[in-house]
Amino acid sequence: MIRTDVYWQKINDLKTALKDAGYSLDIDNQREELLRLEKELEKEEVYTNLEKSTEYSRKAQAIRNKLEVFDKAEKAISDAEEIITLAE
């Protein structure tokens, strides 16, 4: 039988570290900012202004990239939890 307690501890440590990283990266506000930027990009005065639309698009993509990495880390931890549960 596999000693899952060691793995659960590692998972909990990773979850804590990811939560701390989420606070440091201000993930919740980043998600809100992305929504705001996407709404702005839909406005005619923005998408008809090349400079503004380029700036907003760049900012939105940078946020998407951060969120993608963060979300992948969350998913990896969740997958590891499922694997450990199956091993028990």
Positions of predicted regions on the chain:
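Charged, heptad-repeat coiled-coil alpha-helices that serve as long linker/dimerization "arms"
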Residues: 1-88
